[in-house]
């Protein structure tokens, strides 16, 4: 008990018997996805962003590609392939439906919600994993100036493109945290932002959302569309390995070509060439010293390193080259440049939500710099007034989704 309180003084002493201490994963799912894609580019992969598959192309009753539509320009074109893998998460069944192969097992979507408050409102020293009155488990995780906590696990059957946190979700999470930390007393007004995601689980008869297995499964249709669903983010490399091995075997049988074994566990993601945590700290120290001269803090250094890894050097080089009096805007300008030129960002929502996480973890900066960032994108892509207004409305919509509950 004493050791637990030393590591986390916020734990309720009167009911505390003890605690376990273990290593756990923490990541930013959008940043992880981007870095995986960028690393794949180094191995001759081709990337297409904002493109929707509308129908499959068949030859001799085999899927050999897809007709797709550019969501920005409206252009339509075909992509050919020896094999097609459907790894679309919550949308896996939609593509199976297009392929007329949505039979047997199907997805069961559940929603997970997270709330974000100022760190001083929930000042945990480190991540805490705890149970709540209904028997579920929750976590609270410090990140920079904020702490986020969650998550819920409820059935979901609405629009997959607009997954919102509602008042019931927010009230449940706040009540659970206040129950665990009675002296905190968080209210709805303390919530700075929120986000919600979907778990693409495999349906099992008679099981509740929390009871459904998180195991991934592979489905191969009669036309050889290969689909994968279920699983957890922490196992994404193992899931990818299973799919790639399956495709390689099929390819070898059909086209008589063998592939060398690829040891993906030895591949370091772009920007992440750190040997250990002490090396991360040393690099962060160096970045802090570099930006302290222009009034940035330790939290700013940690934000850059946690988001971009050693790619921070690229951003700071651009920062040094930019002629701009306001240092905060100058740094944002360098980040926007990096997002556009290195990460295929096409609009302010991409930047604030999917490339930097500012919408969730630093919502104040979104309000502060939204017009400046909009102007940067307008200049970069030569937008007309209507296009600029549309992207302004889109960002406003996502800000409302993250900061209000109905």
Task: Kindly give the residue locations of the regions a language model identified.
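Well-ordered beta-strand positions in beta-sheet-rich domains
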Residues: 76-80, 114, 266
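Short, hydrophobic/aromatic-rich segments at coil-to-beta transitions
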Residues: 62-66, 124-126
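Glycine-rich beta-alpha-beta "Rossmann" dinucleotide-binding loop(s) and their flanking helix/strand
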Residues: 40, 95-113
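Short beta-strand segments that buttress and anchor functional surface loops
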Residues: 21-22, 66-70
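C-terminal accessory subdomains/tails of enzymes that are appended
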Residues: 3-14, 21-24, 28-30, 42-43, ...
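Aromatic/hydrophobic pocket-lining residues that form π-stacking "cages" and hydrophobic walls in ligand
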Residues: 36
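A conserved short coil-to-beta-strand element within the FAD-binding core of flavoproteins
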Residues: 49-64
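Core beta-strand elements of the Rossmann-like FAD/NAD(P) dinucleotide-binding domain
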Residues: 72-83, 87
């Amino acid at each position: 008990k004493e050791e637990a309180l030393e590591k986390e003084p916020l734990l309720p002493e009167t009911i505390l018997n003890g605690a376990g201490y273990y290593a756990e994963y923490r990541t930013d799912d959008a940043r992880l996805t981007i870095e995986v894609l960028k690393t794949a580019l180094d191995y001759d992969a081709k990337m297409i962003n904002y493109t929707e598959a509308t129908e499959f192309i068949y030859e001799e009753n085999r899927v050999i590609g897809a007709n797709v539509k550019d969501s920005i320009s409206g252009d339509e074109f075909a992509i050919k392939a020896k094999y097609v893998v459907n790894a679309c998460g919550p949308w896996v069944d939609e593509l199976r439906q297009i392929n007329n192969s949505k039979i047997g097992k199907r997805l069961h979507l559940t929603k997970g919600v997270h709330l974000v408050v100022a760190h001083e409102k929930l000042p945990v020293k480190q991540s805490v994993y705890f149970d709540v009155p209904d028997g579920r488990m929750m976590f609270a995780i410090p990140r920079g100036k904020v702490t986020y906590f969650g998550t819920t696990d409820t059935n979901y059957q609405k629009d997959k493109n607009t997954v919102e946190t509602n008042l019931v979700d927010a009230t449940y999470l706040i009540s659970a945290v206040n129950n665990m930390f009675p002296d905190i007393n968080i209210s709805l007004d303390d919530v700075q932002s929120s986000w919600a995601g979907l778990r693409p689980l495999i349906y099992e008869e008679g099981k509740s959302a929390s009871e459904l297995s998180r195991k991934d499964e592979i489905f191969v249709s009669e036309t050889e569309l290969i689909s994968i669903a279920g699983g957890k983010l922490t196992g994404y490399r193992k899931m990818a390995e299973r799919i790639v091995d399956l495709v390689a075997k099929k390819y070898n049988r059909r086209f008589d070509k063998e592939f060398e074994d690829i040891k993906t566990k030895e591949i370091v993601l772009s920007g992440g060439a750190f040997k250990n945590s002490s090396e991360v700290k040393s690099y962060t120290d160096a970045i802090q010293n570099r930006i302290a001269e222009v009034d940035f803090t330790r939290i700013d250094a940690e934000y850059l390193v946690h988001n971009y890894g050693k790619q921070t050097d690229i951003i700071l080089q651009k920062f040094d080259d930019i002629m701009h009096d306001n240092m905060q805007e100058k740094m944002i300008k360098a980040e926007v440049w990096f997002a556009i030129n290195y990460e295929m960002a096409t609009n302010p929502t991409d930047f604030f939500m999917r490339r930097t996480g500012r919408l969730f973890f630093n919502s104040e900066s979104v309000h502060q710099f939204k017009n400046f960032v909009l102007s940067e994108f307008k200049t970069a892509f030569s937008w007309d007034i209507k296009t600029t207004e549309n992207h302004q409305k889109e960002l406003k919509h996502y800000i409302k989704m993250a900061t209000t509950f109905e």
